[in-house]
Amino acid sequence: MSKERTRCREKVLQLLFQKDLGQEVEVDFSDFSPQGQAFAYRLYDGALQYKDLADSIISRFSKNWKLERMGALERNILRLAIAEMFTFSDIPQAVTVNEAVELAKKYVSPEAGRFVNGILRNIVRNWEEVKSLKEGFVDVTPEN
């Protein structure tokens, strides 16, 4: 399942990236097993639900980097990882961070992997504060 989960993350990242660029997206995870589909749909829904909160967290914990200055892929990889941490408490944060770093290295560059790693490690180190931000978050996500 872990290799399939990696492929699910890649597919969700592609959808988030397209959506971030204002493109229409077709959400279809039918090429995955039933468990993979469930994981992918839940991850995608979580990424949409927590997008504004994730952006706030990224802005708070990325030293000297404004969200809008980040590349769209890096920004969406970070959003995806934060959503995964909130949505799947059974997945160790170290696994989520590693998967995000691998996505950044594969789709952007080794430097992007280090960038994503640094921000996510900072978020994980400050997880109690991050959870308190989540508790104060009001979901204003429009219904699709």
Curated annotation (Swiss-Prot):
One of the record's GO molecular function terms: RNA binding
A single BP term in Gene Ontology: DNA-templated transcription termination
Family that this chain belongs to: Belongs to the NusB family.
Alphabetized InterPro entries for the sequence: NusB-like_sf, NusB_fam, NusB_RsmB_TIM44
RNA-binding in keyword set: yes
Key word Transcription present: yes
Organism per entry: Dictyoglomus thermophilum (strain ATCC 35947 / DSM 3960 / H-6-12)
Listed name of the protein: Transcription antitermination protein NusB
The entry's keywords: RNA-binding, Transcription, Transcription antitermination, Transcription regulation
A GO cellular component annotation in the UniProt record: cytosol
Function text: Involved in transcription antitermination. Required for transcription of ribosomal RNA (rRNA) genes. Binds specifically to the boxA antiterminator sequence of the ribosomal RNA (rrn) operons.
Signal sequence, start to end: none
Positions of transmembrane segments: none
